[in-house]
């Protein structure tokens, strides 16, 4: 297991390296201790609730298994989706996660609801899954009262959820202030180490793929990357907004016209540095958004008023693939089309294959990105797969992540 103290990253250096679970395990003494693990089990699900990619669940297993082997009484929780606080919601239950975790651990993992007040016992060497932490009132606002209640449940708090490290919530930040011992799990430590080493002095050209439905959710990151990367490939609704900014028609496609000035500014910043935001030359359109919609490839100048752009076209995909194959470092967050529907998945498939074939060091993160990697079977040909989404991108941007900061503060105290 890698220590946070060995990481070289763009973040401000903390006063002290956070304690790690690895160090606690090496020292012994976890036997009989109550260990509370905040994992990131926020996995994608289909309409029926079935898990479509279990990467994050599998990534959580090493910390859980190590604590069980050490004889600890283990409690694990995570968020799943965005349920309303204080209102149990079967649609956001961790039950499917619990079933998969049971299979991976080879033992039954009971699911407990209403757990914040305690009143339950976990025998040493056993594990329970605590229902979706975002159902607890005060979780998202980092309630001090809730944090203290949760801290009272444990002797050791372990944060093994890099994917939520950018959020100051009760299970990622508050509890770490009050638990008797607070430390970083192996996944969290490994994420920071790998990402930091990759970004210390990245091999050039540095190419980033940032895709998603809205520019607004990734505007700060896009602006930051505009100062760093050599090519900024945009996809999804984000690409539509950039196409509008470039004076192209996008029909009735998802876009944010109020952010055209920001998109143009990013294009200009890149151009002044001799870098680029490649704009699609062809796209795949449909008249409706559905799994059965007919797909039509069109040059960008031929997009009709009633068209929806749902993928990049084959010429654009080939052009971007060449950039990826020539890259020194690749950062990937987000599929470039509606890859869940096969007729709009070619762009993502071509870029995924190019990343797999590139000699560049590649790092990829984000739930949909993990699903695309799994779908195309390239996991063993991506340099490092991060289980973080927003945290992954904010780390790349160099922001201080609250969950890491509080662990560093505890270590320094």
From Swiss-Prot:
Matches recorded under Pfam families: PGK
GO cellular component assignments: cytosol
UniProt-listed PROSITE patterns: PGLYCERATE_KINASE (PS00111)
One of the GO BP terms on file: reductive pentose-phosphate cycle
Entry-linked HAMAP family: Phosphoglyc_kinase (MF_00145)
Assembly mode: Monomer.
Protein's UniProt name: Phosphoglycerate kinase, chromosomal
Organism expressing this protein natively: Cupriavidus necator (strain ATCC 17699 / DSM 428 / KCTC 22496 / NCIMB 10442 / H16 / Stanier 337) (Ralstonia eutropha)
């Amino acid at each position: 297991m890698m220590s946070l103290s060995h990481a070289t990253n763009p973040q401000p250096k903390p006063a002290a390296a956070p304690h790690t679970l690895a160090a606690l395990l090496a020292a012994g003494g976890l036997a009989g201790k109550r260990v509370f693990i905040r994992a990131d089990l926020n996995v994608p699900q289909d309409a029926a609730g079935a898990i479509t990619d279990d990467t994050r669940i599998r990534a959580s297993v090493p910390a859980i298994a190590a604590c069980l082997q050490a004889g600890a009484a283990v409690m694990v929780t995570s968020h799943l989706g965005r349920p309303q606080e204080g209102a149990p919601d079967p649609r956001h239950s961790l039950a499917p996660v619990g079933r998969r975790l049971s299979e991976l651990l080879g033992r039954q993992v009971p699911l407990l609801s209403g757990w914040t007040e305690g009143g339950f016992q976990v025998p040493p060497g056993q594990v329970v899954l605590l229902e979706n932490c975002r159902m607890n009132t005060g979780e998202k606002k980092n309630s001090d009262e809730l944090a203290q209640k949760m801290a009272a449940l444990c002797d050791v708090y372990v944060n093994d959820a890099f994917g939520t490290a950018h959020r100051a919530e009760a299970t990622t930040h508050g509890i770490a202030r009050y638990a008797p011992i607070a430390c970083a799990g192996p996944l969290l430590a490994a994420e920071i180490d790998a990402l930091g080493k990759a970004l210390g002095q990245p091999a050039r050209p540095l190419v980033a793929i940032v895709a998603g439905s809205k520019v607004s959710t990734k505007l700060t990151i896009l602006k930051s990357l505009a100062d760093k990367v050599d090519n900024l490939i945009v996809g999804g609704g984000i690409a539509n907004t950039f196409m509008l900014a470039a004076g192209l028609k996008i029909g009735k496609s998802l876009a944010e016209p109020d952010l055209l000035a920001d998109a143009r500014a990013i294009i200009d910043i890149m151009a002044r540095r001799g870098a680029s935001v490649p704009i699609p030359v062809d796209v795949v359109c449909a008249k409706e958004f559905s799994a059965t919609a007919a797909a039509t490839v069109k040059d960008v100048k031929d997009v009709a008023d009633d068209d929806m752009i749902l993928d990049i076209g084959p010429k654009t995909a080939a052009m971007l693939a060449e950039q990826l194959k020539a890259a020194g470092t690749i950062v990937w967050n987000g599929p470039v089309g509606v890859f869940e529907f096969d007729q709009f998945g070619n762009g993502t498939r071509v870029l995924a294959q190019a990343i797999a074939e590139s000699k560049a060091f590649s790092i990829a993160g984000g739930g949909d990105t993990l699903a695309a990697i799994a779908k195309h079977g390239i996991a063993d040909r991506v340099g490092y797969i991060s289980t973080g989404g927003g945290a992954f991108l904010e780390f790349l941007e160099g922001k201080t992540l609250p969950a890491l900061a509080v662990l560093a503060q505890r270590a320094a105290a």
